Amino acid sequence: MQVSVETTQGLGRRVTITIAADSIENAVKSELVNVAKKVRIDGFRKGKVPMNVVAQRYGASVRQDVLGDLMSRHFVDAIIKEKINPAGAPNYVPGEYKLGEDFTYAVEFEVYPEVELQGLDAIEVEKPVVEVTDADVDTMLETLRKQQATWKDKDGAVDAEDRVTIDFTGSVDGEEFEGGKASDFVLAMGQGRMIPGFEDGIKGHKAGEEFTIDVTFPEEYHAENLKGKAAKFVINLKKVEERELPELTEEFIKRFGVEDGSVAGLRAEVRKNMERELKGAVRNRVKSQAIEGLVKANEIDVPAALIDSEIDVLRRQAAQRFGGNEKQALELPRELFEEQAKRRVVVGLLLGEVIRTNELKADEERVKGLIEEMASAYEDPSEVVEFYSKNKELMDNMRNVALEEQAVEAVLAKAKVSEKATSFNELMNQQA
C-alpha cells in the first residue's frame, strides 16, 4: 500500500492510496472461494460448483464488493499510520480500475484542529455572592399567592396589576390596519404584552368608559408596515378586575406539598427550593463567564463537518419541541442554527482539550451528587435516583455533565476570579 497525504485547504485533507494488484486479486479469489461454498447453481451440488463457473457468474459483483472493502480498510490503516484524526465522514473518490493493475483512489475529509490552550490566566470571572433572605422568601410567597389568585370585579380605576376586558380598534393615519381590532380582549396589566404606551393609556380609566389613546409602534415591530408609525386606538373599557389573593391557610399551604400546613413549613420549603435554584444559577453564571473567556482567548478553525452534524442535532431538537417529524426538521433553514452550532462545536473542542491536558475523568461522587440534586426537585427523590442508576444512557449523560463541570473548574483554577455581592432577584433576572 502506497499512501500520500496533502492539505487541500484549512483543515481539509486528501489522502491518496494505491492498492497493489496482487492484493486485490488475492482478496477476490478468497471471497470467490467463500461464495462457492454457499451458492446453489442448477446442475451442481452445493459447495461443488467449479470456480470458473462461480467467477463467471459472481466475479464482477464480488470484485466490486472487495474493492469497496479494501478501500475502507486501507484508509483506516493509512490514517493510523499517518496519525490523522478525521472529523466527520470521509468522501471516497475512486480512480479508474483496470483488471490486473494497481488501483489508486483518494479520500477527502477534514481533520480536528490542533488546539493549544492559551490565555487562561487572563480570563476574568465574577462570581456572584448571594444568600436567600427573609425578604426574598416573602416576595416568593407573594408570587405564589398571585399565581393562585382569583379575580373580582372592581368599580374603581385601572391600576398596574389589574385585569381588563376591552374592545379596541387601531388606526394609522386614519386607516384601520390588519390585526388592530379585537372584541372582549382580556389583558392582564403589567405583563408587557402590548406595545409601549398601550397599558399606560388604559390606567386611570373605569369600566364603561370609551376613550382614545395615542401610541407609537417600536422600530423593531414585526409588521413592516407599522414599524415606527404613530397610531390611535379607540378603547371601550368593558370590565375591570382586581386580584383577590388567597390567605395562607392550612388548606392553601398543603397544595404545595407541606404536610403540616404551617406557614413556617411553607417558608422552609420555599427557601429550600430557592436555595437550590440559586446554587444552579451561580454555577451557570460562573460557567458561562469561564467558557466565554476560554472561547475569546482561543480562536480555532472548526471542521465544517462537525458544524453540519451539530446543525442536524439542533434541527431535530427544534422539531421535537414543536411536535415536528424528521422530514420537517431537515426543512428548517440551516441559517437559524449555524451560529449556535459553531459555538457549541468550538466550546466542545476547547473543553475537550482541557479534559485531555488535565487527564480528567468523571468523578463518580460528583455524578452521584448531581443526580441527587436534580432528584430533590421531585416528589420522590429516591425513585428518581434509582431510575437513573438503572439507565446507562442517563448515567452517561450525567457523567458528561460532571466532566464538563470539572473542565470548567480546571479553567477557573487558572483564571482571575473575583466575588461580587448581589441579590437573589438580580441574579435570577440575569438568568432569564
UniProtKB/Swiss-Prot annotation:
Protein name: Trigger factor
Major enzyme class: isomerase
Gene3D superfamilies: 3.10.50.40, Trigger factor ribosome-binding domain, Trigger factor, C-terminal domain
Gene: tig
Record's catalysed reaction(s): [protein]-peptidylproline (omega=180) = [protein]-peptidylproline (omega=0)
Entry similarity comment: Belongs to the FKBP-type PPIase family. Tig subfamily.
Gene Ontology cellular-component annotations: cytoplasm
This protein's domain notes: Consists of 3 domains; the N-terminus binds the ribosome, the middle domain has PPIase activity, while the C-terminus has intrinsic chaperone activity on its own.
BP terms from Gene Ontology: 'de novo' cotranslational protein folding; cell division; chaperone-mediated protein folding; protein transport; protein unfolding
Limits of the PPIase FKBP-type domain: 161-246
Higher taxonomy: Bacteria, Pseudomonadati, Pseudomonadota, Gammaproteobacteria, Enterobacterales
Swiss-Prot/TrEMBL keywords: Cell cycle, Cell division, Chaperone, Cytoplasm, Isomerase, Rotamase
UniProt-listed Enzyme Commission number(s): 5.2.1.8
InterPro entries: PPIase_dom_sf, PPIase_FKBP_dom, Trig_fac, Trigger_fac_C, Trigger_fac_C_sf, Trigger_fac_ribosome-bd_bac, Trigger_fac_ribosome-bd_sf, Trigger_fact/SurA_dom_sf
